[in-house]
């Protein structure tokens, strides 16, 4: 009995995935890879296999990675504190040098190696390579008293995306490569900017008119006041939760970049739990999916 049921169950799982494989064939999916999924060995292997499977069945994955824990660990070893405002890392010149060294020189190469070892053709890029990401300085704003202008906060060499060289990514994808992108960018005067990886992923997804933007994080998705998972959330609901302070910290730029990417042509955006093995496949190829789906 069991010997018959088990193969049958596997067949049913494959059949459940079939309409999604058909729907996403030859479409681009941008994945922001970050959090616990980057430091747990089992999850790293799971991620590489998910990306490889997508490529094998005709989907075009583009990976944008973070590296916050690795940067924080390196800064700590050097006796330098990490400071965050509204989920953004305050970045002076010394910190920027460390950020670039860790993101581009270490983390990016490790991810490329993981995917290639699994059988893929990954190529690593920073935003400075081939003028992939043109950036400009980013300032935060904080609301003050009613009827007074917001406070402008300078957080150093933190940038925002000015322009994406989509042709470079498209060319690599067309040649069978899986682009793996570190979130740094170059300013007009040649200065290097640290850019939030979620924001970079959203901008790249918009530039490519991607089918999906998937952000991997260390929580189940977007949570309500009671700490319960929100399965689907629209733009108005997101704005209300931001105003009420329910969406804050590191989740704030994630939700913000998802909504911006949707307005700029991305079909769907998802914030999912990267602590789950095969989180990407569960989101893309099952009826229920996981995490929070964001819509306009």
UniProtKB/Swiss-Prot annotation:
Pfam families (UniProt xref): AA_kinase (PF00696)
Name of the protein: Acetylglutamate kinase
EC class: transferase
SUPFAM superfamilies attached to this UniProt entry: Carbamate kinase-like
Swiss-Prot/TrEMBL GO biological process terms: arginine biosynthetic process via ornithine; L-arginine biosynthetic process
UniProt-annotated location(s): Cytoplasm
Record-stated family: Belongs to the acetylglutamate kinase family. ArgB subfamily.
Site (Transition state stabilizer) location in chain: 32, 254
Recorded metabolic or biological pathway in which this protein acts: Amino-acid biosynthesis; L-arginine biosynthesis; N(2)-acetyl-L-ornithine from L-glutamate: step 2/4
Keywords noted in UniProt: Amino-acid biosynthesis, Arginine biosynthesis, ATP-binding, Cytoplasm, Kinase, Nucleotide-binding, Transferase
Source species, domain of life: Bacteria
Gene Ontology cellular component annotations, sorted alphabetically: cytoplasm
Binding site residues for substrate: 67-68, 89, 194
EC number(s) given by UniProt: 2.7.2.8
One example GO MF annotation: acetylglutamate kinase activity
The reaction(s) this protein catalyses: N-acetyl-L-glutamate + ATP = N-acetyl-L-glutamyl 5-phosphate + ADP
Function: Catalyzes the ATP-dependent phosphorylation of N-acetyl-L-glutamate.
């Amino acid at each position: 009995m069991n010997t018959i049921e088990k193969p049958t169950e596997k067949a049913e799982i494959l059949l459940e995935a079939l309409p999604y494989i058909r729907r996403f064939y030859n479409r681009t999916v941008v994945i922001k890879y970050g959090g616990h999924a980057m430091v747990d060995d089992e999850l790293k292997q799971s991620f590489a296999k998910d990306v490889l499977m997508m490529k094998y069945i005709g989907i075009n994955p583009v990976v944008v990675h973070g590296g916050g824990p690795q940067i924080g660990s390196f800064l700590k070893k050097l006796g330098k504190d990490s400071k965050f405002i509204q989920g953004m890392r305050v970045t002076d010149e010394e910190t920027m040098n460390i950020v670039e060294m860790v993101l581009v020189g270490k983390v990016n190469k490790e991810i490329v190696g993981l995917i290639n070892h699994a059988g893929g053709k990954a190529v690593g890029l920073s935003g400075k390579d081939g003028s992939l990401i043109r950036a400009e300085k980013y300032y935060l704003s904080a609301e003050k008293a009613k009827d007074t202008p917001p406070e402008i906060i300078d957080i150093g060499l933190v940038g925002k995306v000015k322009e994406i060289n989509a042709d470079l990514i498209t060319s690599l994808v067309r040649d069978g490569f899986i682009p793996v992108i570190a979130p740094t960018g170059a300013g007009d005067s040649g200065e290097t900017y640290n850019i939030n990886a979620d924001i970079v992923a959203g901008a790249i997804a918009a530039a490519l008119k991607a089918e999906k933007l998937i952000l991997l994080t260390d929580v189940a998705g977007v949570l309500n006041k009671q700490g319960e998972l929100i399965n689907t959330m629209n733009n108005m609901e997101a704005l209300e939760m931001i105003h009420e302070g329910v969406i804050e910290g590191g989740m704030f730029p994630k939700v913000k970049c998802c909504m911006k990417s949707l307005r700029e042509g991305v079909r769907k955006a998802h914030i999912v739990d990267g602590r789950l093995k095969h989180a990407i496949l569960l989101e893309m190829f099952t009826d229920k999916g996981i995490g929070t789906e964001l819509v306009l």
